[in-house]
Amino acid sequence: MALKEELMKFFEGEEDKRIVVLGIGSSIRSDDAVGLEIIRYLKNKGIKNILLIAADTNPESFTGPIRRFKPTHVLMVDATHMGLEPGTAELISIERIRGQWFSTHHLPLSELAAFIKETMNAKVALLGIQPKSISIGSDLTLELKKAVERVSKIIYESIIAK
């Protein structure tokens, strides 16, 4: 199934959707900033009933604002080691997050996803994007710059199609 169809299926459900997009990453580690860049792109779109959070490397610090927003859906976006071509994006279910270590960060996203699902009764998924480099450096690689534009458009179209 194509990414757009997977996201549209993920966002199905509640009529009054309240969506959180949680961008995770480090702005000083090249492609690790992909989640933050996607949040920046989406903020310029002015989407209603959506909370966009650039969580840097500590997404657990934003559970308070997420809880107050009362989300129906939480989409975490992060650079994710999946052994794929750089820039490849894949929607990863909470069940798959629990079974493997995907993130480039120390906090297991499985714990954060489980906490959000259990305490806020929201659907949770990880949109992982394969990095090329997570070395110290401020710029995304060309592959990830292209992925930011492509994936951001897919997220935007999937949300407004709800």
Question: Model-found features: residue ranges?
Answer:
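N-terminal catalytic or cofactor-binding beta/alpha core of small enzyme domains
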Residues: M1-P131, S138-I160
